[in-house]
């Protein structure tokens, strides 16, 4: 699995910048196991973005953000909502895969990719 850690929220907000509308894509695999991109973390980021005055136009969690077909299906409604940007809660490969399916829309990472490894337990 790919081990990720959350970027500080200030860094994510700086990436989002002046965007008014944001979509969020989480990862149901590695990032969920690392507690950096599962349902709880997507909800946490949504709350933080809304507290900063952003409108979250959609959220989704792909089974694996590194698998193009699954990401394509999850990105379709997010892209249709016409966000100013997408924040992807996955490893760097997931960010690249999401960007492939969001032409013309900036896609930003909320995580730092650390290394290929294994988790001792969820979140560790």
Q: Where do the model's predicted regions map?
A:
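Iron-sulfur-associated redox domains of electron-transfer enzymes in respiratory
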Residues: 1-124
């Amino acid at each position: 699995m790919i081990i990720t850690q959350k970027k500080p929220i200030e860094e994510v907000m700086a990436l989002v910048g002046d965007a008014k509308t944001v979509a969020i894509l989480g990862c149901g695999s590695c990032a969920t196991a690392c507690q950096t991109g599962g349902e709880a973390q997507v909800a946490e980021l949504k709350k933080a973005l809304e507290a900063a005055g952003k409108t979250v136009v959609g959220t989704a969690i792909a089974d694996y953000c590194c698998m193009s077909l699954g990401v394509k299906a999850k990105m379709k409604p997010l892209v249709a909502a016409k966000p100013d940007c997408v924040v992807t809660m996955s490893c760097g490969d997931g960010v690249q895969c999401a960007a492939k399916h969001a032409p013309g829309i900036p896609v930003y990472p909320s995580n730092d990719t650390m290394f290929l490894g294994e988790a001792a337990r969820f979140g560790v």
